[in-house]
From Swiss-Prot:
Class of enzymatic activity (EC top level): hydrolase
Reported cofactor(s): Zn(2+)
Gene (UniProt): mtfA
Keywords, comma-separated and alphabetical: Aminopeptidase, Cytoplasm, Hydrolase, Metal-binding, Metalloprotease, Protease, Zinc
Function: Involved in the modulation of the activity of the glucose-phosphotransferase system (glucose-PTS). Interacts with the transcriptional repressor Mlc, preventing its interaction with DNA and leading to the modulation of expression of genes regulated by Mlc, including ptsG, which encodes the PTS system glucose-specific EIICB component. Shows zinc-dependent metallopeptidase activity.
Example GO molecular function: metallopeptidase activity
Record-level GO cellular component terms: cytosol
Chief localisation class: cytoplasm
Protein name: Mlc titration factor A
EC number: 3.4.11.-
NCBIfam families, per the entry: PRK15410.1
Amino acid sequence: MIKWPWNNSQPQVQTLEHWQAAISIPLLAPLSDEEHQKLAALADQFLKQKRLIPLQELLLTDIMQRRIALLFSLPVLSLGIGALDGFHEVLVYPGPFIVEEEWQDDIGLVHTGKMVQSGQSWDQGPIVLNWQEVQDSFDLSGFNLIIHEVAHKLDIRSSGEATGVPLIPLRDIAVWEQHLHSAMDALQEEIDLVGEDAASMDPYAVHDPAECFAVLSEYFFSAPELLEERFPDLYRCFQKFYRQDPLARLKSWQNNINYRAPSIY
């Protein structure tokens, strides 16, 4: 039973009911009652501080907004809402969207063209999502679009650009980079051996260090057992940075209740 830190007036009871429904997704099931309370409080702050802007006639219902806010708040559960101060707006498409992009090839030529994107995190601007893949982020599968984009914002806070190294003590940077690059090398070797489709983790992680940090942050929160098994040293680095231990949380939850995945309404 979740106990909520609100008084018993009618508007607050209504709010309580909304948060209970929004929290009922598999990703958040392992959190303790205390963590649910803290997460809901952070999500409430998030909704007061950020603008959620639906695009292409998407209707963002109350529970959709609350679930978006909860997923944004999960990676900063111990860091605090101030860690998300690098943006003010979240744009939400119904599904993957097309953008004009520039890229440089191996010989230095710059190309432009249209590309399909799932999400974007602009260095000095909003986060862009698509609701279809936000819904795919509700389970414990290793995929989480919002956590991926939040990781980019946390990365950018460190130096003003995404490098794969978030805001950590200087003494920890060398070890962080060593373990991150080691994970990239191991994943690249696996991809070379079995191909991208058969790889055990998302091959996008080998794109560059920033994407590796973002992709593996998804696993840290939604498939911690896999990340810890494959890259235990990097798991501990993430644990120290995020100040959370999702694997211990998951094991405790599995050991203390009869597992039944929450229904998504």
